[in-house]
Amino acid sequence: MERHITKEVQIGNRWIGGNHPIAIQSMTNTKTEDVAATVAQIKQLTKAGCEIIRCAVPTQEAAAALTEIKKQITIPLVADIHFDYRLAIAAMEHGADKIRINPGNIGSRERVKAVVDVAKERRIPIRVGVNSGSLEKGLVEKYHGVTAEGIVESAMDKVKLIEDMGYDNLVISIKSSDVMMCVKAHELIAKQTDHPLHVGITEAGTLISGNIKSAIGLGLILNQGIGDTILSLIHI
């Protein structure tokens, strides 16, 4: 199996891309504002094999909590941001090693640029995330439905937006609950970019069926040498 070689990206004390090992990422389900509970869960996940942790940052209080959380953990922390660009900026100011955004739901170009400017200043990578469930109406119409091609075009449009702002310290994430659509999308995007790819299958169905879908999808994608970090919902 020949690996799809991508750019190297540093996330805290961890490197992904290039010839670095595929990093296992998981996510917390605590309220990030609850520092004690969040740290305890991250430590359990670390012990179980997690190498990068993602925390939701839905409020300014959650962003502020990252400072103390970071002091107590040993793995890189990714801040998951939706809608409010100010939370992305606050998360970076409070120590996030990477941020996950969808530029399409952050707002205007000016707001995206405000986030990019802080990331550039602090050399913090941005994970550009696109989900089939929130694909732009224009792309759904163009491809006559939600398709792998539409997902890839959406992701690459957002990558270009940030690159045009003079920043290319990026990781790309494309997801769908349709396993084969997700596999095809990864095959397509790997031919179009050398940015590292974060691989995960959107959760759907019961815990068991969701795990089966995830295992099949991840296996098919990784078997083609595609992927630099994977999302694993580790059970502790």
Q: What are these language model-derived features?
A:
Residues 1-2:
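Intrinsically disordered, low-complexity regulatory segments in eukaryotic proteins
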Residues 6, 10-11, 16-23, 30-55, ...:
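Alpha/beta enzyme core
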Residues 181, 207-208:
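Short acidic/glycine-rich loop or secondary-structure boundary segments that cap or lie
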